[in-house]
Amino acid sequence: MNNGMQIFDYEDIQMIPNKCVVQSRKEVDTSVKFGPHTFKIPVVPANMQTIIDEPLAIWLAEHDYFYIMHRFQPERRMDFVRDMKKRGLIASISVGVKDDEFDFIEALAANELTPDYITIDIAHGYAQVVIDMIQHIKHYLPNAFVIAGNVGTPEAVRELENAGADATKVGIGPGKVCITKLKTGFGTGGWQLAAVRWCAKAARKPIIADGGIRNNGDIAKSIRFGATMCMIGSLFAGHEETPGKHVNIDGKEYQEYYGSASEYQKGTHHNVEGKKILLPVKGKIGDTLKEMQEDLQSAVSYAGGRDLESLTKVDYVIVKNSIFNGDQY
């Protein structure tokens, strides 16, 4: 690793404004082309069981937002892809790397079902079995757009891209309900934004910044440092449409939010790298997505541009932890 590399996270960065060239932020185009499709904003809700389910996936696809369906109801995936295709919507699913997942890819091909997007979703994505899965998908479903992760180094990005991945997901344990850094001593928690920058410099294909985003301004910062798309969990948790279990405490409504490697997800205490928290229920997800878009439009206006490209060129300063601690919410 480069010892001269700048280490920072979202709360350590402030971008420096340029002259505004739009009359209104409504003129700003926040759309992003990711693979074969274009989406309203460079944001995707995390593919976690407390964040996304089939009705929400349909709603997101109908409204031109990117989504990735989680992989924790494997028996539903074939029908889900078929249903989305019948609706004329994009089909975007997740797979793991166990033997039956390789069989599932072959079954999709046998049924002549090609999802638009397939995300290989494991905690430590820099692994031979992930490379094997990328090549397996590309052999049986050559037209699927393959997202592979998660990784945290340029070497991993290059190797997964060379294996055939169309995009890589960067982030090892920076999420709000991920405790990888505490359980293992490894990860990008505390320097996730620097890791995104480090990986993006090596990437030839799109990067998804996954985890550690606590505020809408962090989306703009992710774009500045090379991400094409941002995966977000905690900001989407606790909405009326998200599928986490509701809990009433002293008359207040909360929703469960837990990590994909938590014991609540796994149903076992073995190899746990996630935890469960309760978040206040906070209204409709459409309102949050609209607010994200408006804040991103404002960010682009501060960058002196009309679209997301302008964010990639702005100057910035590192102000170590002087704004606030990103976990205060």
Swiss-Prot record:
Gene: guaC
Protein's UniProt keywords contain Transcription: no
Keywords of the record: NADP, Oxidoreductase
Any Pfam family matching the protein: IMPDH
GO biological process: purine nucleotide metabolic process
Identification of the protein by name: GMP reductase
Family designation: Belongs to the IMPDH/GMPR family. GuaC type 2 subfamily.
EC number(s) recorded for this UniProt protein: 1.7.1.7
SS bond list: none
PANTHER family per the UniProt record, alphabetical: GMP REDUCTASE (PTHR43170:SF5)
Chain residues that bind NADP(+): 207-230
Protein purpose: Catalyzes the irreversible NADPH-dependent deamination of GMP to IMP. It functions in the conversion of nucleobase, nucleoside and nucleotide derivatives of G to A nucleotides, and in maintaining the intracellular balance of A and G nucleotides.
Domain of life (superkingdom): Bacteria
GO molecular function annotation: GMP reductase activity
Active site: 178 (thioimidate intermediate)
Enzyme class: oxidoreductase
Entries under InterPro entries matching the protein: Aldolase_TIM (IPR013785), GMP_reductase (IPR050139), GuaC_type_2 (IPR005994), IMP_DH/GMP_Rdtase_CS (IPR015875), IMP_DH_GMPRt (IPR001093)
Catalytic activity: IMP + NH4(+) + NADP(+) = GMP + NADPH + 2 H(+)
GO cellular component terms attached to this protein's record: cytosol; GMP reductase complex
